[in-house]
């Protein structure tokens, strides 16, 4: 407690150095935290899937054009994939420019046509109502429900769907805490109609022990697009299975589906660049923090020298420096999160993703508060702990002009 009071008293007395150091570190941390949150979101896409490393999308290759498609098992020949190997299989149809209407208005929506197995592979939390139980049932996202019904209870409300049929809202689903590759507003059953305007895509989970290498070898065998019309249609295709976690990083496959508003993708090169920028910002902030801290403590060389003459232990000195840096980092973190909160709307628009607070934010802040004070305390501790008392006292007798000059140099230093 005495060390904490002493550290706080020093920071209050050195107001100019404290404020400059606090603001510099806060801006650096705010930028780094924003970037790390974005990188974390990109690396955890579709983690709501039951096992994104072992749920596979079907990638079809036809005349060099590769995209997401389905498994065709119409002919049970030597290259047929036995259904016994498939544990779960879901077929989806993406209706990007779709609409629903009520008595007053018409609403543009992104419709996901799905079967019941989709929610077994990609669980969503139902915050109100029940899952789809009939062909005429539909699920809405919370955002879509507010857009259409406002604050009214949407459960049981009837909407007129684009195919001419009426659908009843049976439930409201919450947005997952993670980013998802498939974006939608409304989910309807694939049994609502026997004919849809778009081709489906499929996701598959194989039974335990199934060799994905063997499945891909079967998929490499060329198949006829129209086996009964080979003389007229000479097109052939192959397919392969790719984990959900990898499809997101393949823009060509996602863009081939032709639904840019419903299928998102990422680029690894962007993650590498942003990671380097984040690291450079953090290093710049740490170096400037240490330099300014040393300027602020330069006058205390006499104090440290006298304490060493009276036998102060290195542990006590390190604890004192660590406490001061811990207080500064803690205050800088609070200010950084305030800056993040103020800028969250423009940043979300820039990065095209609405950020929400998750447990990652807590652990990130806790990690910074624990690790950063230790890193920034090592060099000042080594400088003063291993210097002779006479050297520390002599350094403290330098004129105030030197200290002020160093301060002006650091303050006027251009932003990196």
Predicted stretch roles:
Residues 32-152, 161-168, 217, 416:
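Structured, solvent-exposed hinge/loop segments at the ends of secondary-structure elements
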Residues 115-127, 138-265:
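Mid-to-C-terminal secondary-structure elements
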Residues 264-279, 364:
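N-terminal membrane-entry
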Residues 1-22, 260-263, 293-319, 323, ...:
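Alpha-helical transmembrane segments of integral membrane proteins
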């Amino acid at each position: 407690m005495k060390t904490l009071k002493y550290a706080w008293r020093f920071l209050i007395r050195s107001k100019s150095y404290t404020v400059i150091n606090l603001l510099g570190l806060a801006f650096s941390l705010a930028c780094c935290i924003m970037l790390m949150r974005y990188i974390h979101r990109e690396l955890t896409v579709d983690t709501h899937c039951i096992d994104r490393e072992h749920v596979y999308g079907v990638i079809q290759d036809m005349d060099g054009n590769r995209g997401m498609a389905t498994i065709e098992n119409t002919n049970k020949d030597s290259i047929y994939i036995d259904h016994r190997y498939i544990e779960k299989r879901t077929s989806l149809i993406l209706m990007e420019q779709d609409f629903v209407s009520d008595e007053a208005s018409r609403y543009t929506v992104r419709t996901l046509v799905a079967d019941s197995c989709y929610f077994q592979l990609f669980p969503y939390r139902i915050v109100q109502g029940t899952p789809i139980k009939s062909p005429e049932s539909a699920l809405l996202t919370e955002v879509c429900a507010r857009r259409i019904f406002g604050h009214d209870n949407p459960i049981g409300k009837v909407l007129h769907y684009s195919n001419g049929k009426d659908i009843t809202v049976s439930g409201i689903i919450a947005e997952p805490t993670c980013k998802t590759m498939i974006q939608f507003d409304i989910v309807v059953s694939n049994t609502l109609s026997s004919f849809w305007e778009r081709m489906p895509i499929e996701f598959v989970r194989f039974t335990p022990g199934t060799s994905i290498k063997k499945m891909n070898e079967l998929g490499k065998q060329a198949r006829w697009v129209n086996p009964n019309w080979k003389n007229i249609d000479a097109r052939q295709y192959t397919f392969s299975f790719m984990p959900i976690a990898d499809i997101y990083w393949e823009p060509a496959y996602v863009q081939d589906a032709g639904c840019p508003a419903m299928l998102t993708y990422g680029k690894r090169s962007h993650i590498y660049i942003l990671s380097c920028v984040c690291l450079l910002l953090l290093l710049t902030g740490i170096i400037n923090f240490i330099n300014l801290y040393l300027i602020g403590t330069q006058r205390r060389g006499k104090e440290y020298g006298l304490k060493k003459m009276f036998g102060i232990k290195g542990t006590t000195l390190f604890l004192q420096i660590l406490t001061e840096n811990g207080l500064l980092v803690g205050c800088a973190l609070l200010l950084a999160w305030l800056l993040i909160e103020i800028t969250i709307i423009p940043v979300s628009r820039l990065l095209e993703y609405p950020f929400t607070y998750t447990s990652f934010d807590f652990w990130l802040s806790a990690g910074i508060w624990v690790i950063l004070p230790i890193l920034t305390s090592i060099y000042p501790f080594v400088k003063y702990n291993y210097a002779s008392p006479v050297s520390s006292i002599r350094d403290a007798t330098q004129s105030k002009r030197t200290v002020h000059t160093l301060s002006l140099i650091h303050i006027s230093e251009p932003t990196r």
